């Protein structure tokens, strides 16, 4: 990752964000249950306020969330869809507040409350020495489990660069505490080098990055632009693909990580078939706890030729 210039980190326009970082530092020192309870309240408030005309930013996120849930869960009644959307807001806000603990209060040991299931699958995949692609989705507990996951295995992580220098500094610094390498999504050569070195690379494969680097594959029964890089990376060094999902249990104030056996016969040589398979495992993980998925992102932004826009 390119180093941030002090002039950009400490310019006057960055001062308000530094104030938010200071607030986040304080939040990270609250008891975990308090953080979750605050997240519940703020999540409910954000969902309620998003229905007001002046809350345009949240209104946009609510529109995207409502649309995604309506498309992906047509079997639910309108009232059930609304409840799921509200709960999604709650878990998204809780997830944003939870990050303050591993990133800004690393002395707090979250490992006893983080359970890793299926670690033997990751260890078996790594034993071959060809590197491992640890593929997951954008669940709201994706960053809070970093401390527990890094204690179980030595992992590199791929991330998406933030345009604001302070947020970029914070997310990279926070992740560098727990992962061997923090790689920008665009740095394809670094991914290949690390797989050649036998490294485990964790990344989420469920965002819409446009048609140029994607194929269309069904996701919840809807054609979605799905990155084909997973197939290429796996084929490059014969790297096995292991799926990862993560959830929180608010009743016990704990988190869980679930690792699957390596996908068999992957890649198949058919990018659409491979993308469909990845979408299927992500969808199955979402259905276990749909409220904990990040429905705020425009998963169906890129449409097949001739298809109507959904947002």
Task: State the predicted function of each range.
Residues 57-64, 161-165, 223-227:
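Active-site metal-coordination segments of metallo-dependent hydrolases
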């Amino acid at each position: 990752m390119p180093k941030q210039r002090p002039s950009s980190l400490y310019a006057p326009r960055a001062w308000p964000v530094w104030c938010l970082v200071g607030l986040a530092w304080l939040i990270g020192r609250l008891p975990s249950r308090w953080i979750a309870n605050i997240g519940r309240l703020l999540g409910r408030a954000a969902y309620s306020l998003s229905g007001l005309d002046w809350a345009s930013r949240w209104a946009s996120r609510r529109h995207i969330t409502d649309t995604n849930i309506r498309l992906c869960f047509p079997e639910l009644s309108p009232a059930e869809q609304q409840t799921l959307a509200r709960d999604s807001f709650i878990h998204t806000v809780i997830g944003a507040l939870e990050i303050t603990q591993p990133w800004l209060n690393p002395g707090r040991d979250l490992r006893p409350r983080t359970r890793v299931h299926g670690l033997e699958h990751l260890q078996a995949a790594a034993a071959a020495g060809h590197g491992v692609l640890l593929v997951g989705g954008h669940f709201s507990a994706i960053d809070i489990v970093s401390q527990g996951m890094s204690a179980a295995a030595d992992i590199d992580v791929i991330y998406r660069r933030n345009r604001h220098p302070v947020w970029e500094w914070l997310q990279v610094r926070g992740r560098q505490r727990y992962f061997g390498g923090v790689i920008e999504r665009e740095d394809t050569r670094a991914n290949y080098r690390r797989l050649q070195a036998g490294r485990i690379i964790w990344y989420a494969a469920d965002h819409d990055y446009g048609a140029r680097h994607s194929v269309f594959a069904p996701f919840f029964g809807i054609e979605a632009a799905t990155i084909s890089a997973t197939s290429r990376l796996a084929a490059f060094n014969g790297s096995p693909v292991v799926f990862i999902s993560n959830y929180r249990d608010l009743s016990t104030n704990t988190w869980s990580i679930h690792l699957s056996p390596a996908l068999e016969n992957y890649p198949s040589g058919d990018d659409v078939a491979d993308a469909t398979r990845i979408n299927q495992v992500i969808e199955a993980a979402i259905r276990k706890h749909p409220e904990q998925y990040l429905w705020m992102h425009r998963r169906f932004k890129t449409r097949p030729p001739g298809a109507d826009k959904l947002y």
